[in-house]
From Swiss-Prot:
Protein name in UniProt: Glycerate kinase
Family: Belongs to the glycerate kinase type-2 family.
Modified residues annotated as Phosphoserine in this record: 60
Gene Ontology MF, one: glycerate kinase activity
Keyword annotations: ATP-binding, Cytoplasm, Disease variant, Kinase, Mitochondrion, Nucleotide-binding, Phosphoprotein, Transferase
Linked pathology: D-glyceric aciduria: A rare metabolic disease characterized by chronic metabolic acidosis and a highly variable clinical phenotype. Clinical features range from an encephalopathic presentation with seizures, microcephaly, severe intellectual disability and early death, to milder manifestations with only speech delay or even normal development.
Length: 523
């Protein structure tokens, strides 16, 4: 926690307006104590889904080291283990797998983001790196998370390895978010450029992510169960780190080891809907015309075991345990927070106000209208399994400090050229919302952080705020509305109190979306 404590000197040096001095020192100390606890909980959430712990929970060897157990399945090991992987977190996953199973590993190929090895070396995260003479070949590509020639070479190497396997072999597949861009393998004669152009045109005309994935799978050799088909008749164990709300295995990295449920008619329907069927390249028409109704039929995936080994749910569960150990009543609201960042910020701001009335009954309570508005915002966000009533009841009966936890990914409509990410923007918007409501004798802190350690094109993972944010910003001449209008949340937090509110972790080597923490502590 040394890094977290470094913010104390910066805050001590930060200018305080004379009118704000009375009581500011006490509130500052309280905020810093909450901020330190928030960082602890965030780090515990990330720690629960780091590659090493995840792989060791998912895999185990018998005492003789000749049998691999995955869930309730056993696989014989006799120098027959092969490994492939693709995704932003796969380098560390492969390193953990090599540490556990290296003596049985014959060959491996992984596709990871460009520059990730150097970044891990700079961060001193040796546990995320393969051994010097590893049997796993590493390809770096997909710069800026876009398919490119380097990623294509990696995908073809993965395909070649899979196609050479026999019924006696076992293929371990490591998958994480970002895997789709790192596994581009168009069906010939379609080229990578033609496939990219088509998906860009569809996106520009309003196609949904589900529709885009349907087209990608239909034109790919490896997506939509294609990798599983290539590896047949070998046994396939797919270990998946989910960065998608709800953990749908067919969506994560476009489901290379999950049979596609879509057919050519689905593709043609999508292309017709967006007026692109007539303008298709000849190569795309050729592939679609010769494809079977179900190119990677379900029968090809009976030899596959797909296992989610890490998710936002697991990360939040660990943070909840840590919060309870610190004396908080902790409730997980949802691991599927999604929707517009403005609406989400309004929800968290109003939730803090309504929660305050439950924790401090002597204060004026939330009006019926405010209570109804909170539920309307929740309905607008369409959050599945939202535990809002449980959270409010916990506060009404407990009367102690409360920590509300959530995870997911809000969406941000870009309207400016500033620097930031969805976590810093959400935190800034929540900070602006908190000033709208009288919170009384209660300390409130909100933190939003990306579990991969990188929020947008910045070096911060996220940020934390308190109800004093608006007055702190005004004291330093910072106009919150102006920064939000330009999506410039990172610049704002860099300027505010010397960057003390930024959450810095460095690249974590994992990714299970974002973590939101709302602390409410009666004084």
């Amino acid at each position: 926690m040394a890094a977290a404590l470094q913010v104390l000197p910066r805050l001590a040096r930060a200018p305080l307006h004379p009118l704000l001095w009375r009581g500011s020192v006490a509130r500052l100390a309280s905020s810093m104590a909450l901020a330190e606890q928030a960082r602890q909980l965030f780090e515990s959430a990330v720690g629960a889904v780091l590659p090493g712990p995840m792989l060791h929970r998912a895999l185990s060897l018998d005492p003789g080291g000749r049998q691999l157990k995955v869930r309730d399945r056993n696989f014989q090991l006799r120098q027959n283990l092969y490994l492939v992987g693709f995704g932003k977190a796969v380098l560390g996953m492969a390193a953990a797998a090599e540490e556990l199973l290296g003596q049985h590993l014959v060959q491996g190929v992984i596709s990871v983001p460009k520059g990730i090895r150097a970044a891990m070396e700079r961060a001193g995260k040796q546990e995320m790196l393969l051994k010097p003479h590893s049997r796993v070949q590493v390809f770096e590509g997909a710069e800026d998370n876009l398919p490119d020639r380097d990623a294509l070479r990696a995908a073809l190497a993965i395909q070649q390895l899979a196609e050479g396997l026999t019924a006696d072999d076992l293929l371990l597949v490591l998958i994480s978010g970002g895997g789709s861009a790192l596994l581009p393998a168009p069906i010939p004669p379609v080229t990578l450029e033609e496939k990219q152009t088509l998906t860009r045109l569809l996106a520009a005309r309003g196609a949904t992510i589900q529709e885009l994935n349907t087209i990608r799978k239909a034109l790919s050799q490896l997506k939509g169960g294609g990798l599983a088909q290539a590896a047949y008749p070998a046994q396939v164990v797919s270990l998946i780190l989910s960065d998608v709300v709800g953990d749908p295995v067919e969506v994560i990295a476009s489901g290379p080891t999950v049979a596609s449920s879509h057919n050519v008619q689905d593709c043609l329907h999508i292309l017709n809907r967006y007026g692109l069927r007539a303008a298709l390249p000849r190569s795309v028409k050729t592939v679609l015309s010769r494809a079977d109704s179900d190119p990677h039929g379900p029968h090809t995936c009976g030899h596959v075991l797909n296992v989610i080994i890490g998710s936002n749910v697991l990360a939040l569960a660990e943070a909840q345990r840590q919060a309870e150990a610190l004396g908080y009543q902790a409730v997980v609201l949802s691991a599927a927070m999604q929707g517009d960042v403005k609406s989400m910020a309004q929800f968290y701001g109003l939730l803090a106000h309504v929660a305050r009335t439950r924790l401090t009954p002597s204060m004026a309570g939330a009006s019926v209208e405010e209570d109804a508005q909170l539920h309307e915002l929740a309905a607008e966000l369409q959050i599945p399994d939202l535990q809002l009533e449980e959270a409010l009841e916990t506060m009404a009966w407990g009367r102690g400090p409360v920590c509300l936890l959530a995870g997911g990914e809000p969406t941000v409509q870009l309207q400016g050229s500033g620097r930031g990410g969805r976590n810093q923007e959400l935190a800034l918007r929540v900070g602006a919302e908190l000033r709208r409501w009288p919170l009384g004798p209660i300390d409130v802190l909100f933190l939003s952080g990306g579990t991969d350690g990188q929020d947008g094109p910045t070096e911060a993972a996220g940020a934390w705020v308190t109800p004093e944010l608006a007055s702190q910003a005004a004291a330093e001449g910072l106009d919150i509305a102006t920064f939000l209008a330009h999506n410039d949340s990172h610049t704002f937090f860099c300027c505010l109190q010397g960057g003390a509110h930024l959450l810095h972790t460095g690249m974590t080597g994992t990714n299970v979306m974002d973590t939101h923490l709302l602390f409410l502590r009666p004084r």
